[in-house]
Amino acid sequence: MLSPKRTKYRKYHRGRMKGKALRGSKIVYGGFALQATEPCWITSRQIEAGRRVLTRFVKRGGKLWIRIFPDKPVTMRAAGSRMGSGKGAPAYWVAVVKPGRIIYEMKGVSDKIATRALKIAGYKMPVKTKVLKPL
């Protein structure tokens, strides 16, 4: 699963997801893409689940690009711990995804296979997605 080698700080604020994605909303590498239509946090496990679906569905053909990276740690307190005594330890990593952000890109496979594979990968995401095709 994806995670940063090192970060400036161990724990981060939750933050807010306002507006649309400014960057990463256009197809750059491949021909087909999976685009988020809602704001959410996508965990490194969910990114990996989508990647597995795509690589298995296209078998040996095609190239895949993952356009998001989980760089934000999410902390969790131990179950049954009382209030107070600081923030919990980092539990997992998430990528902050705004509407319009491209999650995956594909190239080198047929229209039918790419569309079907990206649609299945979209079911693994915690957000509504749409498949973008080349013009």
Swiss-Prot record:
Matching entries from CDD domains are given as: Ribosomal_L16_L10e
A GO BP entry is:
mitochondrial translation
In terms of domain of life, where is this protein from? Answer: Eukaryota
Q: Which SUPFAM superfamilies match?
A: Ribosomal protein L16p/L10e
Q: Does the keyword Coiled coil apply?
A: no
Main location group: plastid
InterPro entries named in the record: Ribosomal_uL16, Ribosomal_uL16_bact-type, Ribosomal_uL16_CS, Ribosomal_uL16_dom, Ribosomal_uL16_sf
A GO term for molecular function: structural constituent of ribosome
Compartments, record wording:
Plastid, Chloroplast
Keyword Magnesium assigned to the entry: answer is: no
Q: Which GO terms describe its cellular component?
A: chloroplast; mitochondrial large ribosomal subunit
- Which Gene3D superfamilies does this entry report, sorted A to Z? Ribosomal protein L10e/L16 (3.90.1170.10)
Keywords, sorted A to Z: Chloroplast, Plastid, Ribonucleoprotein, Ribosomal protein
Similarity comment: Belongs to the universal ribosomal protein uL16 family.
**PANTHER family per the record?**
50S/60S RIBOSOMAL PROTEIN L16 (PTHR12220), LARGE RIBOSOMAL SUBUNIT PROTEIN UL16M (PTHR12220:SF13)
Oligomeric form and interacting partners: Part of the 50S ribosomal subunit.
Please state what the protein is called.
Large ribosomal subunit protein uL16c
Species of the source: Stigeoclonium helveticum (Green alga)
